[in-house]
Every structure is written in C-alpha cells, then in structure tokens.
Amino acid sequence: MRIYIVEDDLSVINILEDIIEAQGLGEICGDCGGEPANLADVLRSKPDVVLVDFFMPVKDGVEFVKELRTVNTTIKCIMISQV
C-alpha cells in the first residue's frame, strides 16, 4: 500500500513515517514536508491512501479532501489530528 502524508508539522510526519515503516503498514510514497499540500504532488505520487491533517494553516484537511475528490475518488483518505 502506497501512503502519502499531508501534514504541516515535520515532527508529526517523521513520527508517522517511523510507525508506518516499523509496523510494515505500507510504503511512504511522499509527504508535503511541512508545507501547504500540493494536490498535483499527491496525485503524481499515486498513493493508495492519504493521511490528511485535519487542522492546517493554509488549507484545512476537509478542503484538501474535497479538492482531491473532484479529480480522484479512489484514493482512500484518513483524517488525522494531534488535538
């Protein structure tokens, strides 16, 4: 399973990547590097699943998923938050 991480906090990205790799849950095919999510980058990575931070400063997770759904309805999205 190919996993892309959309998260604005680099420490959370690193933790998620460590857990996913240690547990053998899938292959990390990319992350947004703590920057605002770029839909084109996500699509280019061809993920099966996108982990999406619910609260992000530029575009929140719900907005991102709505945008993703306009061009791809097969990628699974899992909303995450560190609240």
Where are these regions (language model features)?
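Active-site residues of response regulator receiver
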Residues: 53
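Acidic, metal-coordinating helix/loop segments flanking the phosphotransfer/catalytic sites
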Residues: 31-49
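Short amphipathic alpha-helix used as the core "switch/output" element in two-component signaling
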Residues: 62-74
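His-Asp phosphorelay/catalytic-motif detector in bacterial-type signaling
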Residues: 46-48, 72-76
